[in-house]
């Protein structure tokens, strides 16, 4: 059976860094308050002339180099983003042009913080069906442009960045994307949303969130979806080498680990240094895990994310 495997990983963070102390100069907060509640110490912010497609292309180039794959071999580009350059054309087609991937078709996927897991699942199925052999899956966000910088409940949480993986066709039984599970429930759409929209009022708007309730749902749904994918594949917690959760808040990661009795050293944590980058957070965490020597060939990892909608999902992969 055909199976897609991760051939390469790349990431990009803007040069500009905003620390908690710098935020405290403009909004009522402190480094101690932010770190205690979120674990976040800093976030990267895109320059005014930097677009989501720029960051996506930068991460994709590094992923292609890591995979030793030529741009002409890419058959599909999916960009998971909530903050595209424009309403249309898609960010993915702009990235396609920047990368000169002439043989690919490209489109965006919007599932907010779950976007990368959704995109991985879609690309995996294109490869399994034989429609493409190699795909670029990118998560890229400029969340700083949809923040109310006077709202300390949200502006301290988010950052900008991009991460990418190259997926390729692989018939090896012991590697690749083993399975994915996706969920959504629109009944919760008013708990995490933006105040704007193209049809709604013609403006991008800013993020609004019922933090306490979202926090509770995140722990519950991430925990349940991890157990679901383990059960589907007859695996136990101890069979998994790494748990790569959406990097929204270190307390969510800690509480999921505690609830499922996952040894904390198996949790990949990078939120401290880039904040919540929405669809970019999981590929950024994967890139960190690989570059730091944690993630190795044949390791089993679970990717798990939850985002506005609500949308949530998991991916079981052997590297």
UniProtKB/Swiss-Prot annotation:
Gene3D superfamilies recorded: 3.40.47.10
Protein name as catalogued: Beta-ketoacyl-[acyl-carrier-protein] synthase III
Location relative to the cell: Cytoplasm
Superkingdom: Bacteria
GO cellular component, as recorded: cytoplasm
Quaternary structure annotation from Swiss-Prot or TrEMBL: Homodimer.
Pfam families on file: ACP_syn_III (PF08545), ACP_syn_III_C (PF08541)
Keywords: Acyltransferase, Cytoplasm, Fatty acid biosynthesis, Fatty acid metabolism, Lipid biosynthesis, Lipid metabolism, Multifunctional enzyme, Transferase
InterPro entries tied to this protein: ACP_syn_III_C, ACP_syn_III_N, FabH, Thiolase-like
Entry similarity comment: Belongs to the thiolase-like superfamily. FabH family.
GO MF term set: 3-oxoacyl-[acyl-carrier-protein] synthase activity; beta-ketoacyl-acyl-carrier-protein synthase III activity
Active-site residues, record numbering mapped to chain: 113, 246, 276
């Amino acid at each position: 059976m055909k199976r897609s495997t991760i051939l390469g990983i790349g990431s990009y963070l803007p040069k500009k860094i905003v620390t908690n102390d710098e935020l405290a100069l403009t909004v009522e907060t402190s480094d101690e308050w932010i770190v205690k509640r979120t674990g976040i110490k800093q976030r990267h912010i895109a320059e005014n002339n930097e677009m989501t497609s720029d960051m996506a292309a930068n991460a994709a180039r590094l992923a292609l180099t890591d995979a030793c794959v030529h741009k002409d071999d890419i058959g599909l580009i999916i960009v998971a983003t909530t903050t595209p350059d424009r309403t249309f054309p898609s960010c993915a087609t702009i990235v396609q042009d920047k990368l000169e991937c002439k043989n690919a078709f490209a489109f965006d996927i919007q599932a907010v913080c779950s976007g990368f897991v959704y995109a991985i699942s879609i690309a995996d199925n294109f490869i399994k069906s034989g429609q493409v052999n190699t795909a670029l899956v990118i998560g890229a966000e400029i969340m700083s442009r949809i923040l109310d910088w006077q709202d300390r409940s949200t502006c301290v949480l988010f950052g900008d960045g991009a991460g990418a993986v190259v997926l390729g066709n692989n018939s090896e039984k012991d590697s690749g994307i083993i399975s994915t599970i996706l969920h959504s429930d629109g009944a919760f759409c008013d708990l995490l949303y933006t105040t704007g929209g193209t049809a709604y009022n013609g403006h991008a708007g800013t993020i609004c969130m019922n933090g306490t309730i979202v926090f509770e749902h995140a722990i519950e749904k991430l925990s349940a979806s991890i157990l679901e994918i383990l059960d589907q594949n007859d695996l136990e917690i101890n069979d998994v080498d790494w748990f790569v959760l959406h990097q929204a808040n270190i307390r969510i990661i800690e509480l999921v680990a505690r609830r499922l009795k996952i040894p904390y050293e198996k949790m990949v944590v990078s939120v401290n240094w880039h904040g919540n980058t929405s669809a970019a957070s999981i590929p950024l965490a994967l890139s960190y895990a690989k570059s730091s020597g944690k993630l190795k060939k044949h390791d089993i990892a679970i990717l798990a994310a939850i985002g506005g909608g609500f949308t949530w999902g998991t991916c079981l992969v052997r590297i």
